[in-house]
Curated annotation (Swiss-Prot):
Residues 118-129, 494-507, 554-565 have a biased composition (Basic residues). There is a cross-link at K18, K83, K226, K332 (Glycyl lysine isopeptide (Lys-Gly) (interchain with G-Cter in SUMO2)). This is Zinc finger protein 512. InterPro entries: Krueppel_C2H2_Zn-finger, ZNF512_C2HC, ZNF512_znf-C2H2, Znf_C2H2_sf, Znf_C2H2_type. It comes from Macaca fascicularis (Crab-eating macaque). Residues 1-30, 85-147, 484-565 are annotated as: Disordered.
Length: 565
């Protein structure tokens, strides 16, 4: 029988020494290879010449007469994690040794208990010991049942608000929120103690920011006003200016009002009317002494007087309305009240300015009295054609569809994007049936085709009369204008009268003049003579005549040129 690795077949009869030697070598090789395959780590020993009389029956089976291998010590095998070889083998060609099977988990655990370091070297990582479950974490996972409160109680309302919004605010201060009813109750026990109290006046405030603002606004190193004391306006304005500079805004001090302002005037205007009824507010209204129009603020009344009635006129104290008295007493930017002498000086300056303005009226045009719009210009516009509602509706529909309208007159190619533009065009279109009028100048009755033409005519030809005096100007200014016109008319009349009288005198020289006129003429002649004397005295003194011997003799002029005979 031949082996799997090509062993030499056994022969009958006597064998030589060489044959026995080769047989022993081949058998040893076969046994070594078989032991490597089975992972037994067994070492084979050669057979003795005397004992081996025949060839091995099989390459993988040991000789039955003598043990073919010996085992290492058990300690050495355990140190290298090697299991000792099994004593029995599975017979047959397809049999597999049980040595190659993996050890059960129980044996590995036992080996690990005996040699933990070796276990760590083999597996390459440290195995963590199993942790036991924490009983506290399991207890926390247990969901608590929702608390039950009495129906309609405050606790139930707070609980519903927490479920809805996530927190509930303190009903006392409305500034602190809690997520649980127990926390809210604990806060409410000390809620009154947590409020900030001003050590100046004892006022309780909800937050630290509110306390800081209160101290800054009311106790800013200034004397505190008590009941019955009058407010010093310059001091109050200075205090408000400091608060506004530091905090950036002024808040109303009333508890029910949360208004804030960024200007001192707005704050003072609000404080005067905050918390007052309609009857009190009506008494505080200021009325214009010209037209009686009511205003809620002095600034509004002052603007009305400047825009509608010109500059504010200064009246004596007896005839001045109360509202204007209050306005005149209003403090200026420096905090000083205007004195009476200053008011009188301003009044005289205003009169002088009005007189100068009246003198320069033809040269200078005041901004209010210039003609910025067409209603003040002295010209008339022609009438525009009328259109039916159906035509207008059709034009509007065309604009929505095509975004343009064409002139309906035949031969006209004008296109417009609005109904008003088409209307203005039809008023001046020459291809239509409508005969448009012309623009007429009311100063000289001249007609123009276009509006720009009549405007240019008025601005250039009637430069002094092109504006209309504003009827709402001040009465004092109108009086000055009338007085100036009367003076100019009187001067013109006097000049005309003088010119007529001088002409009459020239035409009638033989008529004797009355004594009054003679005296006037004599006085005039005397004045003329005196003026002549004064002018003569003012002139340089005449030079004395020089004797003839000292005078230079000038050669007579000749018509001959030099160098010619």
């Amino acid at each position: 029988m031949s082996s799997r690795l090509g062993a030499v077949p056994a022969t009958s009869g006597p064998t030589t020494f060489k044959q026995q030697r080769s047989t022993r070598i081949v058998g040893a090789k076969n046994r070594t290879q078989c032991s490597i395959k089975d992972n037994s780590f067994q070492y084979t020993i050669p057979h003795d010449d005397s004992l081996s009389g025949s060839s091995s029956a099989s390459s993988c089976e040991p000789v039955s007469d003598f043990p073919a291998s010996f085992r290492k010590s058990t300690y050495w095998m355990k140190m290298r994690r090697i299991k000792p070889a099994a004593t029995s083998h599975v017979e047959g060609s397809g049999g597999v040794s049980a040595k190659g099977k993996r050890k059960p988990r129980q044996e590995e655990d036992e080996d690990y208990r005996e040699f933990p370091q070796k276990k760590h070297k083999l597996y390459g990582r440290k195995q963590r010991p199993k942790t036991q479950p924490n009983p506290k974490s399991q207890a926390r996972r247990i969901r608590k049942e929702p608390p039950v409160y009495a129906a309609g109680s405050l606790e139930e309302q707070w609980y519903l608000e927490i479920v809805d919004k996530g927190s509930v605010s303190c009903p006392t201060c409305q500034a602190v929120g809690r997520k649980t009813i127990e926390g809210l109750k604990k806060h409410m026990e000390n809620c009154k103690q947590e409020m900030f109290t001003c050590h100046h006046c004892g006022k309780q405030l909800r937050s630290l920011a509110g306390m800081k603002y209160h101290v800054m606004a009311n106790h800013n190193s200034l004397p505190i006003l008590k009941a019955g004391d009058e407010i010093d306006e310059p001091t109050e304005r200075e205090r408000l200016r400091t608060v506004l500079k530091r905090l950036g805004k002024l808040r109303c001090m009333r508890e029910s009002c949360s208004s804030s302002f960024t200007s001192i005037m707005g704050y003072l205007y609000h404080v005067r009317k905050c918390g007052k009824g309609a009857a009190e507010l009506e008494k505080m209204t200021l009325k214009c002494h010209h037209c009686g129009k009511p205003y809620r603020s002095k600034a509004g009344l002052a603007y009305h007087l400047r825009s509608e009635h010109g500059p504010i006129s200064f009246f004596p104290e007896s005839g001045q309305p109360e509202c204007l008295k209050e306005m005149n007493l209003e403090s200026k930017s420096g905090g000083r009240v205007q004195r009476r002498s200053a008011k009188i000086a301003v009044y005289h300056l205003q009169e002088l300015a009005s007189a100068e303005l009246a003198k320069e009226w033809p040269k200078r045009k005041v901004l209010q009295d210039l003609v910025p719009d067409d209603r003040k210009l002295k010209y008339t516009r022609p009438g525009l054609p009328t259109f039916s509602q159906e035509v207008l509706h059709k034009w509007k529909t065309d604009i929505k569809k095509y975004h343009r309208i064409q002139c309906p007159n035949q031969g006209c190619e004008a296109v417009y994007s609005s109904v008003s533009g088409l209307k203005a065009h039809l008023g001046s279109c020459t291809l239509g049936n409508f005969v448009a009028g012309k623009y007429k100048c009311l100063l000289c009755q001249k007609e123009f085709v276009s509006e720009s033409g009549v405007k240019y005519h008025i601005n250039s030809v009637h430069a002094e009369d092109w504006f209309v005096v504003n009827p709402t100007t001040t009465k004092s200014f109108e009086k000055l204008m009338k007085i100036k016109q009367r003076q100019q008319e009187e001067e013109k009349r006097r000049q005309q009268h003088r010119s007529r009288r001088s002409l009459r005198r020239r035409q009638q020289p033989g008529i004797e003049l009355p004594e009054t006129e003679l005296s006037l003429r004599v006085g005039k002649d005397q004045r003329r003579n005196e003026e002549l004397v004064v002018s003569a005295s003012c002139k340089e003194p005449e030079q004395e005549p020089v004797p003839a011997q000292f005078q230079k003799v000038k050669p007579p002029k000749t018509n001959h040129k030099r160098g010619r005979k």
